[in-house]
Amino acid sequence: MTVLIDSWAWAEFFAGSKIGEIVKTYVMDEDQEIIISSINLAEIYRLALDRFDEKTAEKRRRAMISRCYLIPVDEEIAISGAKFRHERDWGLGDALIYATAIREDATVLTGDPHFKGLNDVIFLGD
């Protein structure tokens, strides 16, 4: 099973929270194939810049890139994401991330309420 670790889950992982410990089991499992969208990378980088500094943002970027396959938003994902955004009351970022997971046949690991109840989602939130 390929897992797309969503920004919500990465934020918990980097915070070292209880839920982050669950995310860590996926990250540390060398047999686990992990992907991220370029949107996830941008969101976590921005979050680190907002809360910390560029050095921390770079450290987190390197950690993500060293462990995950980075899937850029291409034309197919952009169109699919736009359709998801049109059908649901989501932000475009979440729609692009979900479109990436669908295209790559991946399960989304997240606690973001937008993803709750969807197929191919491991939901970590309440």
Please give the residue ranges for each predicted region:
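Short, well-structured N-terminal submotif of metal-dependent ribonuclease cores
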Residues: 1-36, 48-62, 126
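Histidine- and aromatic-rich ligand-binding microenvironments
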Residues: 5-6, 36-38, 89-91, 112
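A generic structural signal for short hydrophobic patches within well-formed alpha-helices
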Residues: 10-11, 41, 78, 115-116
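Acidic catalytic patch
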Residues: 64-87
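Acidic, PIN/NYN-like endoribonuclease modules and their adjacent C-terminal/linker elements
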Residues: 67, 98-126
